[in-house]
Amino acid sequence: MLTLTSYFGFLLAALTITLALFIGLNKIRLI
């Protein structure tokens, strides 16, 4: 159970970082 929770946490963190980078690149491209 703990491994599943940590796996989902890691997946969520990776998704958040990817989304943040994507938004950052889009903002830089707009400027």
UniProtKB/Swiss-Prot annotation:
Membrane topology field: Single-pass membrane protein
Pfam families attached here? PetL (PF05115)
Transmembrane helix as a keyword?
yes
Recorded GO CC terms: chloroplast thylakoid membrane; cytochrome b6f complex
Any one of the GO BP annotations:
photosynthesis
Answer yes or no on keyword Plastid.
yes
Where is the protein localized?
Plastid, Chloroplast thylakoid membrane
InterPro entries for the chain: Cyt_b6/f_cplx_su6
Q: Which residues cross the membrane?
A: 4-24
Alphabetized UniProt keyword annotations:
Chloroplast, Electron transport, Membrane, Photosynthesis, Plastid, Thylakoid, Transmembrane, Transmembrane helix, Transport
State the Gene Ontology terms under molecular function. Answer: electron transporter, transferring electrons within cytochrome b6/f complex of photosystem II activity
User: Which coarse location class describes where this protein primarily resides?
Assistant: plastid
Q: Which domain of life is it from?
A: Eukaryota
Q: Assembly and partners?
A: The 4 large subunits of the cytochrome b6-f complex are cytochrome b6, subunit IV (17 kDa polypeptide, PetD), cytochrome f and the Rieske protein, while the 4 small subunits are PetG, PetL, PetM and PetN. The complex functions as a dimer.
Q: What the protein does?
A: Component of the cytochrome b6-f complex, which mediates electron transfer between photosystem II (PSII) and photosystem I (PSI), cyclic electron flow around PSI, and state transitions. PetL is important for photoautotrophic growth as well as for electron transfer efficiency and stability of the cytochrome b6-f complex.
Give the family, as the similarity comment puts it. Belongs to the PetL family.
Name of the molecule in the record: Cytochrome b6-f complex subunit 6
Record the organism: Triticum aestivum
- The protein's gene is named petL
